[in-house]
Amino acid sequence: MIKQRTLKQSIKVTGVGLHSGEKVTLTLRPAMPNTGVVYYRTDLNPTVAFPADPNSVRDTMLCTALINEQGVRISTVEHLNAALAGLGIDNIIIEVDAPEIPIMDGSASPFIYLLLDAGIEEQNAAKKFIRIKEYVRVEDGDKWAEFKPYNGFRLDFTIDFDHPAIGKDVRNYEMNFSAQAFVHQISRARTFGFMKDIEYLQSQGLVLGGSLDNAIVLDDYRILNEDGLRFKDELVRHKMLDAIGDLYMAGYNIIGDFKAYKSGHGLNNKLLRAVLANQEAWEFVTFEDKEQVPQGYVAPVQVLI
């Protein structure tokens, strides 16, 4: 039986909030089988819970933000969510003492190290997957994202920025998902932004924690980070990272073929909602026999970094 996963022990880290620029403490705790992924705002009294749910994503302007019926929010969840998807963690309590998850270095890599440091433990309950059964597509102008059936998790993402530092040879990335592939090919890709946009946003009191330490920054001609890129196609890899995190808002690893063109948090969420709203388009599956599991999900719990 392919089993559910949680952490072996709790672990804590501090970082900076991307939007507030303030110190944020993040605590990750083990959870019982079938708990799912649950975010908590511990700075509020009483504590407010945000179970991972695509319908709770109500702001996708600059990040993926969960907002409850009372308007309480928790922002920038997508990179941590991507790390959970990458390692196949089903059940976890995520506590944060601020309205946002710390940005760390702008990638999912620090969260991977944190989760592996806590240790991953299999639980005595069958792991559920969402299997795509029918073709589903959403569009927004020339942007689009789609799912179709596939026995694995395959991703194909294309960006299109008219910028001299983003050549046509670094605008597409394709990958067959596995824990190892995510850790080595995707998790280290950092978020990015354009200097003119960042200056405007900071004048509006946003992205106050943004810097060259936690983002790739481009002016009109070049990349401003002294150390350059971690991959020549780091930007499109980060967009794939975002998509993996956004799609894991379902709370389950997905078996299907995902393809997107110029998609962002909003369209990723729209696709996930469209899939889940059509009961003919998907089903829950579990696997008693490891031989039946799609190759990308057979990986051992421990991942070598």
Swiss-Prot record:
SUPFAM superfamilies documented for this protein: Ribosomal protein S5 domain 2-like
Catalysis performed (reactions): a UDP-3-O-[(3R)-3-hydroxyacyl]-N-acetyl-alpha-D-glucosamine + H2O = a UDP-3-O-[(3R)-3-hydroxyacyl]-alpha-D-glucosamine + acetate
Designated gene of the protein: lpxC
Name of this protein: UDP-3-O-acyl-N-acetylglucosamine deacetylase
Keyword terms of this UniProt record: Hydrolase, Lipid A biosynthesis, Lipid biosynthesis, Lipid metabolism, Metal-binding, Zinc
An MF annotation (GO) of this entry: UDP-3-O-acyl-N-acetylglucosamine deacetylase activity
PANTHER family named in the record: UDP-3-O-ACYL-N-ACETYLGLUCOSAMINE DEACETYLASE 1, MITOCHONDRIAL-RELATED
One annotated Gene Ontology cellular component of this protein: membrane
Organism: Haemophilus influenzae (strain PittGG)
Active site: H265 (proton donor)
Family as reported in the entry's similarity comment: Belongs to the LpxC family.
